[in-house]
Amino acid sequence: LHLPRRHRLSCARSHTGNAAEEIVMPVNRQFVLDSRPTGNVSPSNFRLVETPAPAPGAGQALVRHLYLSLDPYMRGRLNDSKSYAKPQEVGAVMGGGTVGEIVASNNPRFKPGDKVVGMGGWQDYALSDGRDLHVIDVTRIPIQAYLGPVGMPGVTAWYGLNKIIAPKAGETIVVSAATGAVGSVVGQLAKIAGAKTVGIAGGAEKCAYARAELGYDSCVDHKSPDFVAELKAALPEGVDGLFENVGGIPFATCMSRLNNFARVAVCGLIASYEGAPTALDNVGTLLITRSKIEGFIVGDHLALWPRALNELAGHIAKKRIRYRETIAEGLEKTPEAFIDMLKGRNFGKQLVKVV
């Protein structure tokens, strides 16, 4: 493998009767979970280690990562508690979505140079038997988009909107975290369906972007001291569909404005990931309005991924869906970028450019 010097380490190999021979091998930098956070995540919860990049065995391929995906669900996996996903093991490489390039392969499905999307985690290189890898076409769509609007976040948006909310033309759809990787796609798909869209985002800049670039009819700043009153004022006709990514006060306020037979898709509750959850004190609204509320995990619906990805790719190629990225430069910035994302400091999809 031909790599920059900063990605190399040396070791010695001896042969009988010959002098020691130096072999140059690539270094695999890895972030492992060093300790579980109590409260807010800290950089000290992660540890950077360096090991030789592994050689692929029978049926395996070696991937050099180009971009890492950072997503809110990762916070829940840091806790040693029951959830829909297995807790991240202490001492193990942090898991997560990746896009990269095949650099060596003993698997007939992949050849060196192939661009792939997978779940290689927070490291320079990863071995795979191919079950979690998919070759991607980067001629029409940028490679990092396969971690965003044409990846897990995009499919999450597609499923929650189409299969749970099922918007009708003229209905009012509310999206919290409206400019995030998932929310930004939800809002644009809802507009394509003919709905009126109301976004909730953090800060005047994000709300301006939601209206001007993502096409939201209105956007309410959850950092405003008058947020509750402003959100209610933005919903004079009530809420027909709610795509919930945040929880807390925004969720409770929207619940109080549900119309009859409204549909609520609960995708995430990031407001409670690092603290005590906010109690929902108006669940009676669900009965009064005969509304439906459904939590979902997009990984439960793999059979629908090809259809969703095909539709999303078409929208991206025709520029019907716009997206924005925050990219941290260098693997070493991963913990800091992860923490910034949890605090809402990112704009759009949070990525790490590895090389």
Regions found by a protein language model. Name each.
Residues 94-101, 111-177:
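NAD(P)H dinucleotide-binding glycine-rich loop of Rossmann-like/cofactor-binding domains
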Residues 2-24:
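Short, Lys/Arg-enriched N-terminal segments with co-localized hydrophobic residues
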Residues 52-70, 78-122:
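Glycine-rich beta-strand-centered segment in the early N-terminal region that forms part
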Residues 249-321, 354-355:
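Glycine-rich phosphate-binding loop and adjacent beta-alpha segment
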